[in-house]
Amino acid sequence: MPTLLLGASIPFGTIAYTLFIFLLLLVMLRKFAWGPLMGIMKEREEHVTNEIDAAERSNAEAKKLVEEQREMLKQSRVEAQELIERAKKQAVDQKDVIVAAAKEEAESIKTSAVQEIQREKEQAIAALQEQVASLSVHIASKVIEKELKEEDQVKLIRDYIKEVGEAR
């Protein structure tokens, strides 16, 4: 009949029935609750793992892109600096060419001016020599025409100079 379990009397059939129901409940829970629940948990774990992997890949790719951008920015700065240096050198070279051309032109103008002054000086000297010769001949002819005293010669020269001054 009944067995004693902790001092209480419970019929064996009830214990067997309860044990059977408990085991049936465990099997059903495993099949219908823990199985799907564990499947969902496994799927969730895989999903989280995949998301973490994707985030790590995205992070690595972002770091790679940032590094590439930094490298490109660095390269751009180097190219810009080279461009500035070339422009400065070109400006200095162009300045040197312009200054050299200006010096050459100034020297040419100076040489031309010196030659022009020399020509005009020679022409003025030739014209003056011609006038002096003409004046000398004219005075000599006047002196020959009349024998003059010193006072008359001085007066004659002054008159002639006055005549020449008015003719100009």
From Swiss-Prot:
InterPro entries: ATP_synth_B-like_membr_sf, ATP_synth_b/b'su_bac/chlpt, ATP_synth_F0_bsu_bac, ATP_synthase_B_chain
CDD domains: ATP-synt_Fo_b
Keywords: ATP synthesis, Cell membrane, CF(0), Hydrogen ion transport, Ion transport, Membrane, Transmembrane, Transmembrane helix, Transport
Gene3D superfamilies: 6.10.250.1580
Locations listed in the record: Cell membrane
Record membrane topology: Single-pass membrane protein
Superkingdom of the source species: Bacteria
GO cellular component assignments: plasma membrane; proton-transporting ATP synthase complex
Primary location class: membrane
Alphabetized Pfam families for the sequence: ATP-synt_B (PF00430)
Positions of transmembrane segments: 9-29
Single annotated GO MF: proton-transporting ATP synthase activity, rotational mechanism
Family affiliation: Belongs to the ATPase B chain family.
Function text: F(1)F(0) ATP synthase produces ATP from ADP in the presence of a proton or sodium gradient. F-type ATPases consist of two structural domains, F(1) containing the extramembraneous catalytic core and F(0) containing the membrane proton channel, linked together by a central stalk and a peripheral stalk. During catalysis, ATP synthesis in the catalytic domain of F(1) is coupled via a rotary mechanism of the central stalk subunits to proton translocation. Component of the F(0) channel, it forms part of the peripheral stalk, linking F(1) to F(0).
Self-association state and partner proteins as the record states: F-type ATPases have 2 components, F(1) - the catalytic core - and F(0) - the membrane proton channel. F(1) has five subunits: alpha(3), beta(3), gamma(1), delta(1), epsilon(1). F(0) has three main subunits: a(1), b(2) and c(10-14). The alpha and beta chains form an alternating ring which encloses part of the gamma chain. F(1) is attached to F(0) by a central stalk formed by the gamma and epsilon chains, while a peripheral stalk is formed by the delta and b chains.
PANTHER family: ATP SYNTHASE SUBUNIT B (PTHR33445:SF1), ATP SYNTHASE SUBUNIT B', CHLOROPLASTIC (PTHR33445)
Listed name of the protein: ATP synthase subunit b
Originating organism: Bacillus mycoides (strain KBAB4) (Bacillus weihenstephanensis)
Gene name, Swiss-Prot/TrEMBL: atpF
